[in-house]
């Protein structure tokens, strides 16, 4: 009877040792799938009619502009900064023909 109890205890310990790394791998997987702030891109576009376009400064008239997280795209020109919710973004514009 003692031999069966000892063998059962050894078997349980062996199963716990094997299950431990599986749980650790399962905990790591969600962290690997999360995207960091450097991967995120925010784009906010503005559209207006001609009457309100007269109120816009001449430097951005005839352009489509967006607030980007860090850098402008290759076809865009950095015009300034956007402040949204207390966070500063890069203000990028491209010409509309």
From Swiss-Prot:
Organism of derivation: Pan troglodytes (Chimpanzee)
* UniProtKB keywords: Antibiotic, Antimicrobial, Cytoplasmic vesicle, Defensin, Disulfide bond, Fungicide, Secreted, Signal
UniProt PTM comment: The three-dimensional structure formed by the three intramolecular disulfide bridges is indispensable for effective bacterial killing.
In terms of SMART domains, this protein maps to: Defensin_propep, DEFSN
Propeptide positions: 20-63, 97
Name the UniProt record assigns to this protein: Defensin alpha 4
Subunit structure of this chain's protein: Homodimer; homodimerization seems to be required for killing S.aureus, but not E.coli. Interacts with CD4. Interacts with Bacillus anthracis lef; homodimerization is required for the interaction.
Any one Gene Ontology BP term: killing of cells of another organism
Where mainly located?
secreted
Q: Output a single Gene Ontology CC term carried by this record.
A: extracellular space
| Cysteines engaged in disulfide bonds, as pairs | 65-93, 67-82, 72-92
